[in-house]
Amino acid sequence: MKKNFKALTLIILILNALCGHAETKKGKPIHSIIPAPVSYISSKGKFSIRPGTAILINSSSKELSKLAATLNEVLINYGISPLPVTTLQENKQPANSILLSVDNYNEISSAEGYILEVSKKTITLRATTGKGIFYGLQSLLQLMPVQDNNKSGLSSVKIPACKIIDYPRFPYRGMHLDVGRHMFPVEFIKKYIDLMSMYKVNNFHWHLTEDQGWRLEIRKYPQLTETGAFRRSSPIGRNAGDDNIFYGGFYTQEEAREIVEYAAGRYVNVIPEIEMPGHALAALASYPHLGCTGGPYEVWTMWGVHDDIFCAGNEGVFHFLEDVLTEVMDIFPSKYIHIGGDEAPKTRWDVCEKCQQRIKEEKLKDSHELQSYFITRIEKFLNKHGRQIIGWDEILEGGLAPGATVMSWRGTEGGIAAAKMGHDVIMTPGSHCYLDHYQANPAGEPFAIGGFTTLKKTYSFEPVPDVLSEKESRHIMGAQGNVWTEYIKTPAHVEYMAYPRAIALAEVNWSPRESRNWENFVGRLVVNMKRLDLKNVNYSKSAFGVDVGMQYDENSEKLKAVLKSDLPGAEILYTITDKNGTSSERIYKAPFEINAVSIIKAWLSDRSGLPLKISERKVWHNDAFGIKPLLNTLYDHRYQANGNISLTDGLRGDANSLINDWLGFLGEDADLIIDLGGEKDIQNVSIGLLHNPGNWIFMPAAVEIKLSEDGIKYTEAGGIKPDIITPSEPGGILYSIINIQQKARYIHIKAKNIGNCPKGHPGEGSKAWLFVDEVLINTGL
């Protein structure tokens, strides 16, 4: 009964949300506004926007007139003709009117804050700036019913009576887009900005330059776009080969200005990023004298980090960058200019005569301090022109430039260090804010860079680390979602990866920490998904899928299938297909046993009102199924899946994800023993092996099988030699089947790590990874 009550509660929550309501944990009604406002108090009745309603503004400013026009544009979608816009007379608001008022209101302390009051007779939206009015309008628009554009005109639009007091928690609320790896049309960039502004996101971080392409026209240096904007090919998968397809493009200065102006109209600041000193190969290919070796260089056709960077000992590099930044500042009025600063190998600097001379002349300790010199020099130039720098957290290395803002991506540690030093920080750790990561089981997702960042995980992010004092915490400006595009080629794919996780992060950035509630957020998100449908946004429904996994029951000593959802109380339905056919649809109530090779399909009940997302997983039942192996070597803690049982849980690892099912061994062999519990006639043994050189993962040098009757004395029973250990394709999986045809109780399997990355590999000489997964044993029984 308890589970049924939870399911009923969720259904009521969703149905309320579909009517514009959701329930907070305190039981007070709140409408489907994202981000959740600071305060929402409901009243009785509704205001009807209808022909005859007037929009009033308290001044004749162009800004307020444009904001009134924004409201009219939305009402047209409801079939309501544009309402007349007039200036408020005698400071009295008549009935049947909507007032947009900007003034020095004492009760509104934030420039982005607003107070929205809806009664049966009037709507009043007050703020101290046009920006506050704009954000108040976004909340007002989300109070309106979801209406398909012009398909059924309404005689009126009803808004529930309420009072909202609202302002942001953080001043910086960002979204990022990498156009260096893959580029996207101007119209899509505008759509991206539209979606940001809907959810009160106020900074667009535009990553414009990379090793793989320079994307902004610089008129003084035309080769940057004539040469640097194009590459001869792109990688296949994770650097598994070239596609031999010429790729490139760039934004003209006119297009960039157009985007800046468009964003400004939606109160979004555009922050350009010009990478330095690393990720500069496209610039070096255009002007080889800017590198330490002088070239020749080409725009890079692989993903990753390249050793060739701007030469810090070459005075011409600084002249070049100052010229570039001068044109950039002319296009972008942003207070902040992002200069990158990340992933800059010191390989070339350490042997470059000019760089070493610079270190000597400036009395620097090493190449890390040389990077600090580089960044500080660029900062001084930008400061002189009234701008400030933002850099990735590597700019901490060797000493932080005096006024730099740090963007902390390698966890939160860099941000903590910078805040303790008195520097402003934008939190964007990969664990929660990298929206190019997988958001659900990789087997059912588009190919991605890796990682595993669910919607719920993004929503759980707290930008202010507990270790910071109150004073230090004030330096946390907010958080940002990053979309890197190595494996994202189309606008639709960008939308799929960014949404709805960007919406979750928007609430993290805006709403009070104490008001965040996952179940309530989901209720409001359902309504917003319908709004995204109307805007043709290809958002992901993965958060509404079901995780199909296996769990070892210590009491029964058996493996059982477990179905989980991130949505509390949601009813899960499933079917099982095995040798006997497909079962009827069942309601999941508890973990269940699997007794044959099976395919499990699971989804959330449509009675919940949630989007349909079917999850599917094959379970490879075999004679090793559920037997905990004994491991003689320890896997690396970074790739431990579910521990030893991961090797015999019936779930095969996916080549696209390194986290969920694989055990990773760094420089070590995978050495394990399986006890079948009694002597059996073993026909064959199979083990899963991953080959992914781009991530320093290689096939083993050999796989050896030994058998024993007593667990003490072992005899060789077969194996695979290196000459036949080749996956079907680069970056693929080999499920090796080793013929045995012998009786035994104990099976000893050793996959021998090659030791170090081979000659010619970027990691040459470093420890190699060995990844192993499912062990299948067939006894013919």
Task: List each language-model region with its residue ranges.
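Contiguous, structured surface segment used for ligand recognition
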Residues: 23-170, 493, 509-535
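Aromatic, loop-rich ligand-recognition surfaces of beta-strand-rich domains
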Residues: 654-718, 730-781
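Short, compositionally stereotyped local motifs that mark structural "simplifiers"
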Residues: 22, 44, 56, 512, ...
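Bacterial Sec-dependent N-terminal signal peptides
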Residues: 1-29
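Feature activates predominantly on carbohydrate-active enzymes
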Residues: 107-336, 377, 381, 480-484
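Flexible, acidic glycine-rich loops studded with aromatic residues
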Residues: 389-394, 399-404, 410-560
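Surface-exposed loop/turn motifs at beta-strand-loop junctions within extracellular Ig-like
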Residues: 129, 604-608, 753-755
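Active-site neighborhood of glycoside hydrolase catalytic domains
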Residues: 301, 305-402, 409-417
